[in-house]
Amino acid sequence: MTFAGKLTKAAAFVAPLLGGASHAAPPEAIPAVVEIETPIAATAPLQGYMRAPDGAGRWPAVVLLHACNGNWRQLDQRWAKRIASWGYVTLTVDSFGPRGLKNTCTSGAPVDLAFDAYRALNFLVQQPSVDPARIAALGFSQGGWLTLTSVERGVVEQSAAHKFRAAVAFYPPCLDFKDDMTVPTLILTGELDDWTPAVECRSMVEGRDDYGISRRSGDGVPIRLIVYSGAYHAFDIPTPGALDYFGHHLEFNRQAADQSIDDVRNFLYATIGAKEPVKEQIK
């Protein structure tokens, strides 16, 4: 998987966001289109699905970022619906549709994609149902890279007016991160992942990289790495069997998937808070 290197400043954007209800049991509300900004210079509007818990108040929130194959609607159904039922506002971003992209698994992500998490964050902090001090980013594969890029001390994080308070990255590519994370960060990956190897994430977490550069002891915020035994890339996505995708092995692992639900819920509860965690499984 190829990902963009240097980052450039992203343009302003128009962001139609589809909203829905949160609880699994009641029927979902009819999605509503929300227009965020209408600058004349906008060339890549941002869109997505937004869910909110029932009831008044200001809720913690999570921005969800999809992988290099898009599928943001499936991500909303698979993870955002669940997280919203825990008591969080969720915003699942579609980075590809407005850009006319279908897949960036071999071509690499556009450089301005790295700012999409903050474009979503800037929208959420304006919502009366969101607590602006309790917003996390959660991404998968390429979206995991975007998540880590968003909270790594560097040009993206430092140029942002508002900040994330926590970050979760599922099986991200961990190469090329040379600086510290600025918020509590959780990385979840599979022991047998042959696309974004766990060993690369372990090196990053331990402050080592392939350039021989190590983070200074005591700097930044600690990163927690969880490696699921026997799990491959995309272990949380239910599929009928193993798949070969661009030469990489993808396979659902129920044990790892169920455990990741608990791990994410516990981490979010500890960092930005909502309902107290209880055991849950993938259906």
Regions found by a protein language model. Give the residues of each.
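Bacterial N-terminal signal peptides that target proteins for export
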Residues: M1-A11
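Bacterial N-terminal signal peptides
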Residues: K9-G19
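N-terminal cap/lid segment of alpha/beta-hydrolase-fold proteins
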Residues: A25-G57
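Short substrate-entry loop that stabilizes the transition state in hydrolases
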Residues: G55-W59, L64-K102, D176, D194-A198
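Primarily recognizes the serine-hydrolase "nucleophile elbow" in alpha/beta-hydrolase
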Residues: R73-L75, W86, A117-T182
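Short beta-strand/loop motif that positions the catalytic acidic residue
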Residues: I187-T189
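Active-site-adjacent alpha-helix of alpha/beta-hydrolase-fold enzymes
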Residues: E191-Y245
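Catalytic active-site module of serine/aspartate enzymes centered on a nucleophile-bearing elbow/loop
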Residues: D244-K283
